């Protein structure tokens, strides 16, 4: 962390999450007297409103992903680390990740949301969520596989149930 920043006496801010909130915050912190590290498990920002287009093969994954290093590279006081957060030590003010530990004076957790299945194990194991590019690609693959399975059925007797899909959006 020290090699990117000239003045190591500046307060350290660690931001967990490179989504909309995390990126908006780094824009605001640009050129302010802080050393900022953005940590995300992906090296790209996903434009989530278009994930359904990836799942339905309307767009490619690259068209809704923006490299975080490209965005952050122009900000002299901000660095990016590709890592997953494994723990936060509030006493020692450290974020423990798969890429090491990061000390902070201020910690911002902007890691996004997870799907709440409300304890329904059937929903959790038999549905697809749509919060990331890998999940959208998994959904696309499952849909295409169902079409392939239906085509393989005996001629004139397609398994129509294999072609039923339900998309729920709240």
What are the language-model segments listed below?
Residues 1-10, 78-166:
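FAD-binding core/adjacent interface of flavoenzyme oxidoreductases
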Residues 2-78, 160-169:
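Beta1-alpha1 glycine-rich phosphate/pyrophosphate-binding loop at the start
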């Amino acid at each position: 962390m020290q090699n990117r920043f000239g003045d190591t006496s500046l307060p350290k801010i660690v931001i967990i999450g490179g989504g909309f909130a995390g990126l908006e915050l780094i824009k605001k912190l640009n050129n302010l007297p802080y050393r900022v590290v953005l940590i995300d498990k992906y090296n790209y920002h996903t434009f989530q409103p278009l994930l359904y287009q990836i799942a339905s093969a309307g767009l490619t994954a690259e068209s809704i992903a923006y490299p975080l290093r490209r965005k952050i590279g122009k900000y002299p006081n901000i660095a990016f680390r590709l890592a997953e957060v494994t723990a936060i030590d509030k006493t020692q003010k450290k974020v423990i990740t798969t890429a090491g530990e990061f000390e902070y004076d201020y910690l911002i957790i902007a890691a996004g949301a997870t799907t709440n299945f409300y304890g329904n194990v059937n929903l959790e194991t038999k549905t697809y969520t749509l919060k990331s590019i890998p999940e959208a690609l998994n959904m696309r693959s499952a849909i295409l596989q169902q079409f392939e399975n239906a085509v393989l059925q005996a001629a004139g007797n397609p398994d129509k149930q294999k072609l039923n899909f339900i998309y729920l959006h709240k």
